[in-house]
Amino acid sequence: MQQKMLRILEFDKVKEQLAEHASSALGLEKIAALVPSSDLDEVAVWLEETDEAAAVLRLRGYVPLDGVVDIRSHLKRAAIGGVLSPIELLEVAATAAASRQMKQLIMSLHDEHGGLARLADYADELAEVPALEEDIRRSIDDHGEVLDTASDRLRSLRGQIRAAEARIREKLESIIRSPSAQKRLSDAIITIRNDRYVIPVKQEYRSAYGGIVHDQSASGATLFIEPQVVVELNNALREARAKEKQEIERILRELSAKVAEHDEPLKRAVEALAHFDFLFAKAKYARRLQAAKPAVNNRGYLRFLQARHPLIDQDKAVPNDIVLGGDYTTIVITGPNTGGKTVTLKTVGLLTIMAQAGLFIPAADGSEAAVFRSVFADIGDEQSIEQSLSTFSSHMVNIVDILRHVDEESLVLFDELGAGTDPQEGAALAIAILDEVHGRGARTVATTHYPELKAYGYNRPGVVNASVEFDTETLRPTYKLLIGIPGRSNAFDISRRLGLDERIIERAKVQVSAESHSVENMIASLERSKKQAEEDEARAHSAREEAERLRAEWEQKLEELEDKKAEQLAEAAQKATDIIRAAEREAERIINELRRLQKEKQAEVKEHELIAAKQRLAAAVPVVEKRKKTKKATARHAFQSGDEVKVTSLNQKGYLLEKVSEDEWQVQLGILKMKIHERDLEYIGSAPAKEVTPIATVKGKDAHVSLELDLRGERYEDALVRLEKYIDDAVLAGYPRVSIIHGKGTGALRQGVQQFLKQHRAVKSFRFGAANEGGTGVTVVELK
């Protein structure tokens, strides 16, 4: 892209504003070299990088670039064995710190939020050399002075220097405080000449102190003498300072050598930091302009929504929608020379090359920019938009050059096409030039004040007229672009507003042809119609937004209701679960209590105790509403004594003993009898009568047989003897079912018990206990 065109469109001023946001000379160097690209893929990458940098600013608000310095020359000197100064070493440390901090920032944000793939690639090039940073910071202070802590020898030498200086001052102060000092000295001070401590002695007392004369005053009346008593001390001080200088040189050489060790990674880091500074300058500039990332294409289609000229105060700039390359490829902006047309023209060109340079554009989201191979502009005599137009010859030189190169991948901008010559000939030339450029497929925006071009957009496919709105009340352009409406002359309205006599205005109107007058009236009518259409569209847009707002509001309310419903259902389910769990715990406690009573030696469970336990167990069971399907199935079956049923609330099987009320049954559940409501029962099938035989009871304290036999801890042989006797006693007692507790353990006793039961003639069947009966630690035996 020609530098001349960039200068005409004032891209250099955009770069000047962009440079205000750079943090280092490295960033400024990149900005100075910035030129638009005509490669679509490259432009897309540049915009993506700017977008990622803008995302970092949104997430963090800052980037660690303040300490970045161009240290490439430092690295080069260090690499060939040169010694860096303390300030240069500090700049290396500061740049290394910025590299480390930037890498940590980008990588942490990329890991946390994602979406920073391109910046993460650049961050991979950033060096992390904390040891080098620490060595430099430990040796040199912020003012570039080598610290005592740089080495033990330097600390020792500086201690010697301070001690020598103190002794010298002590001796010289004793001289200037002596009674004779007032007479012999020009002033009672200690000063330094040639790096040696001296005192000002009057000329006539030159020999009073002996020593060496190092200087004299301009008049010669005062001599600066190093008294003999401090000559040796000054010599020792000078020697110590020479050694200090040598040690400092050694330290700087050592640090420079360490810098040289990291030469390559630091070089790559400098290049990466330069690019980061460049990208974040673009992101900061976008924030300043309230700019947006445009989509890009190579179809020659641009759509700038609410576009503003970037060099005009953004609070005062009038936004315009500008579309080109769709239904029409040429826009002809007509109307009087008010200045608004040129601003619009430059806005199109400048926003295009900004996008092609990877910059966000001052336009609304949803904007789209075309990537052109060439952008041509004939706008004045390379002057700013505030200055006057150039001559016809200057225009024509530019136009001839443009016509040599223009093609379908070009954007062409003509300002006041055909101006500066005879109006009739100028208008004819303008039409011919537009036809040529339009015919080559270029995208064109042209401004003109010739009325002959007002009809141009109506007679050519792919061409549209436009104008810049003019406020006849304020006599100023509003800078609002009106697409589809040609500009009209406002000379009569302006003259009337300025006080010109109405008779003169009417006389002037007579001189205007009827055709021109008709065209002006038509344009005025178009303006009114367009304004009305825009107002209608604005009202429709407002109504649509209100409808969207209401829809979103109701969707939110519906979502809140659904959430509340789900929350209430979850709460109810939790309450039900809590009730059932409480009932299970109470039932378990009651059963355990019964088992404890039965296991006690010689203990009998009295009838009233058993009844009380049954009642507590029944009270602990919640009444649970079953599903409709279950209720219907239950209603269809007529329960009878002896039916095998399932108590759904307890998930236990049992047998119906007798109906105790209209809708309640007494149910045998293991060793317990309970009253259960019919709605809590599920029919399983009929059962043998003896399955529901009441638990037999042998009267008398000595004749009581427990329903359980606990063999845990017994020796194998003793356990089998007890088991055989227990089965016989249970059969005699008439028990239909008993439980043998053998524990889980190694399984030896369990296997022995079950092997014995297989062979016993009185055993009908046996099984492991259910989860609430003791599991595999218990065998439940059905007796014949």
UniProtKB/Swiss-Prot annotation:
Q: Name one GO molecular function term.
A: ribosomal large subunit binding
Keywords attached to this entry: ATP-binding, DNA-binding, Endonuclease, Hydrolase, Nuclease, Nucleotide-binding, RNA-binding, rRNA-binding
Q: Which GO terms describe its biological process?
A: mismatch repair; negative regulation of DNA recombination; rescue of stalled ribosome
**CDD domains linked:** ABC_MutS2, ATP-synt_Fo_b
Task: Show which residues constitute the signal peptide.
Answer: none
Q: Where is this region: Disordered?
A: 527-546
Any idea of its EC number? 3.1.-.-, 3.6.4.-
Q: Matching InterPro entries, A to Z?
A: DNA_mismatch_repair_MutS_C, DNA_mismatch_repair_MutS_core, DNA_mismatch_repair_MutS_sf, MSSS, MutS, MutS2, P-loop_NTPase, Smr_dom
| Taxonomic superkingdom | Bacteria
Q: Pfam families this protein is in?
A: MSSS (PF20297), MutS_V (PF00488), Smr (PF01713)
- Residues annotated for ATP binding in this entry: G335, P336, N337, T338, G339, G340, K341, T342
Domain Smr residue range list: 709-784
Whether ATP-binding counts among this entry's keywords is yes
Q: Does the keyword Transmembrane helix apply?
A: no
Function field: Endonuclease that is involved in the suppression of homologous recombination and thus may have a key role in the control of bacterial genetic diversity. Acts as a ribosome collision sensor, splitting the ribosome into its 2 subunits. Detects stalled/collided 70S ribosomes which it binds and splits by an ATP-hydrolysis driven conformational change. Acts upstream of the ribosome quality control system (RQC), a ribosome-associated complex that mediates the extraction of incompletely synthesized nascent chains from stalled ribosomes and their subsequent degradation. Probably generates substrates for RQC.
Q: Which family does it belong to?
A: Belongs to the DNA mismatch repair MutS family. MutS2 subfamily.
Q: How does it assemble?
A: Homodimer. Binds to stalled ribosomes, contacting rRNA.
Annotated protein name in UniProt: Endonuclease MutS2
What is the organism of origin for this protein? Geobacillus thermodenitrificans (strain NG80-2)
Q: Which gene encodes it?
A: mutS2
